[in-house]
Amino acid sequence: MSDTSILAYCRPGYENDTANELTSRYGEAGFYGYPVSKKNSGFAHYHLYDAAQLEQTVTQFAVHDSIFPRQLVAVFAAINDVEKEDRVGQVLDALKEVEKPFSIFGAVDVEYPDTEEGKTLAKFCRKFTVPLRQALRKAGWLTAKENLGKPKLHIFFASFEICYIGFTLPSHASRDHLGICRLKFPSDSPSRSTLKLEDALVNMLSNKQQSKVLRSGGRAVDLGACPGGWTYQLVKRGMYVEAIDNGLIADSLMSTGLVEHHAADGFTYRPQFGRVDLLVCDMIEQPDRVAKLMGDWLVKHWATHAIFNIKLPMKRRYETVVEAMTSLNSRLDALDDAFAVKVRHLYHDRDEVTVTIVRTSKDEV
Ligand SMILES: C[S@@+](CC[C@H](N)C(=O)[O-])C[C@H]1O[C@@H](n2cnc3c(N)ncnc32)[C@H](O)[C@@H]1O
């Protein structure tokens, strides 16, 4: 059955926020449609009124530039009555019905929602991939060898009965299965929060941005640092850190000689030795208060770059993030420098989003 929609994978519980984001972003760009989402399903749809716009939406929106989606799949077919006996045949039939959006796909991924129900599909999806891949190659849908430079075919099982068929472009998609990048907890880190910053460093900054922001020997300030998971990431990369928090910081960090701990209020603390390369902040505070504080540090040149979390309220989460970021962005826009700003709800974030702001001089842009 033909179906034309954008399918966004997301953290369970965030379907409504994801749907609001899709509606707002695609609608503003003239891709009109309507959202469909079900609480705790782990995904949301945005159905396009004009099917001809599907390819254009894929080239226009990258998942890395969105907030809540972990993956954005352009869906061109759906099967609503998957039959146990001939699933491969049904997928091939569904593909036959559509015009090939790209002559050939370079890879196929069989996926499922990141939910408890989704976990029951994991084993089946893994096993199903093998015969499906063979059949797709035989039918000319897939390159003979995996080619990750070409569009990828996604077969997403929402349940054992319903599956969506769509594609992503490598430049605009997450390379990770289910759009999830799982990181290994470093056992010598003082807290699990360390994974949030590592996720941001690895998945939100390009290699070039990483070497610029995380200079060995560079200086950083960590607001709300204790017990030290974020400071740990910076110290690991050879940075000097002013760790600000009334709590206790791990001795293992203090003994590196790279950390100064100040028991102070993060809202009034100012850098001890002039401008720092990087400001990070993980204080649990009102979104607009944190955004204002980050803006002050960047506008006043106390920090060159910033990475911080915005804690999400229970309701109007997408709107709250947009409001906080709109006022911050307008302050940055007034400066002579240019700023690369990203906001993502990362896999290791729970009820928060991560913001990275990398400064470049306008000549570099
Ligand atoms: C989520 S924890 C930070 C965890 C830390 N990033 C880590 O990886 O270990 C939040 C911290 O912010 C601190 N905090 C909250 N409000 C603060 C303020 N106004 N000034 C300084 N620290 C604050 C709390 O004491 C708490 O330790």
From Swiss-Prot:
Enzyme class: transferase
Enzyme Commission number(s) of this protein: 2.1.1.186
One Gene Ontology cellular component annotation held by this UniProt entry: cytoplasm
Keyword tags: Cytoplasm, Methyltransferase, rRNA processing, S-adenosyl-L-methionine, Transferase
Pfam families in the cross-refs: FtsJ, RlmM_FDX, RLMM_N
Reactions catalysed according to its record: cytidine(2498) in 23S rRNA + S-adenosyl-L-methionine = 2'-O-methylcytidine(2498) in 23S rRNA + S-adenosyl-L-homocysteine + H(+)
InterPro entries: RlmM_FDX (IPR040739), RlmM_THUMP-like (IPR048646), RNA_MeTrfase_FtsJ_dom (IPR002877), rRNA_MeTrfase_M (IPR011224), SAM-dependent_MTases_sf (IPR029063)
Keyword Transferase on entry: yes
Keyword check for Metal-binding: no
Subcellular location: Cytoplasm
A GO molecular function held by the record: S-adenosylmethionine-dependent methyltransferase activity
Any one of the GO BP annotations: rRNA processing
Residues involved in S-adenosyl-L-methionine binding: S193, C226, P227, G228, G229, D245, D265, D282
Active site: residue positions: K311
Function: Catalyzes the 2'-O-methylation at nucleotide C2498 in 23S rRNA.
Family per similarity comment: Belongs to the class I-like SAM-binding methyltransferase superfamily. RNA methyltransferase RlmE family. RlmM subfamily.
Record text on subunit structure and interactions: Monomer.
Protein name: Ribosomal RNA large subunit methyltransferase M
Source organism phylogeny: Bacteria, Pseudomonadati, Pseudomonadota, Gammaproteobacteria, Alteromonadales
